Structures are given as C-alpha cells and as structure tokens.
C-alpha cells in the first residue's frame, strides 16, 4: 500500500508498473529501516524477501479491503439498516487507515525475515505507521480533488 503514494505510476509499463513500484518501495523502506535502527540485513534473504513482498503487498491490500468491507457491512448485518452502511462507505480516509494497519501487520511481519536479528514488533509498528501516514497524506491532499465523484463526500 505504501508504494502507491511515493513512486509515480508509469502508464507505458501497464500492470508491470505495480511490480516495479512495489519492489522498489519495499526495498527502500527496508534499507532505510536497517540504516536507522542499525539492524543487520541478511544479504541472501533481502532480495528474496523483497520480491515476495510484492504479492504480499497486493494480498495485504485485499485483506485490508475485506476488513473494511466487514466493518462497513456490520450495521446492515446486525440491524438491517443500509443507511449507516452507505454513510460509512463514503468516508474512505478512515477505512484506508484501517487498511494500512492490516497491511502493516502482514508486511512488517513478513519483512522481518530479511534481517538476521530484528525486533519484529518494532518493524511491524514502523510499517503500520508508514502506511497510515501515506494514507492520511492521500486522504488530505488528493481526495478533495475527487469531490462529487462517488464514493467521496465533500
């Protein structure tokens, strides 16, 4: 999820752009984390783990979307009232932050295998914060440009 906001999309590459952006951003984030925390990187596992983070990135977005969908749909399931479900679905910024937390847990734990010795809890929290901050940046700066377009409310 983090990669969408930091590396621009190149239309000429098509779907392959997703793979390049995801790999580059995950590798940059892990390298920066290793430098900041002075963690030791396993030179053999690092490229393998960053390659495996690409499909996990997509899976984390799907998992976060399912969690958000479950939360939005819960009032309808419990009380049969669709109005609250419709109101919650309009505010994607809050649900995007929830997606970022779920994605941060999945990616942070998986990324910990690229290090020889690392505090997994700290890495997961760092990944969750990075995803949440990038989601809030998009919600604050880019969502207002979509005013009037469903599902955004202005």
UniProtKB/Swiss-Prot annotation:
It is found in: Cell membrane. GO terms for cellular component: plasma membrane. The chain crosses the membrane at residues 15-37, 58-80, 95-116, 123-145. It comes from the Archaea. Keywords: Cell membrane, Membrane, Transmembrane, Transmembrane helix. This is Uncharacterized protein AF_2166. The keyword Membrane applies. It is a multi-pass membrane protein. Its main location: membrane. The keyword Membrane applies.
């Amino acid at each position: 999820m983090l990669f969408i906001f930091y590396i621009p999309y190149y239309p000429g590459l098509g779907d392959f752009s997703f793979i390049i952006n995801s790999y580059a951003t995950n590798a940059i984030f892990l390298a920066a984390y290793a430098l900041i925390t002075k963690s030791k990187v396993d030179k053999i596992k690092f490229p393998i783990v960053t390659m495996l983070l690409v499909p996990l990135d997509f899976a984390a977005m799907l998992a976060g979307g399912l969690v958000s969908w479950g939360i939005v749909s819960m009032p309808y399931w419990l009380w049969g009232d669709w109005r609250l479900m419709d109101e919650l679905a309009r505010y994607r910024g809050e649900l995007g932050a929830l997606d970022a937390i779920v994605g941060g847990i999945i990616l942070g734990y998986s990324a910990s295998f690229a290090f020889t010795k690392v505090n997994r809890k700290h890495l997961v929290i760092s990944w969750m914060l990075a995803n949440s901050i990038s989601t809030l940046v998009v919600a604050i700066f880019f969502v207002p440009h979509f005013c009037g377009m469903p599902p955004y409310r202005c």
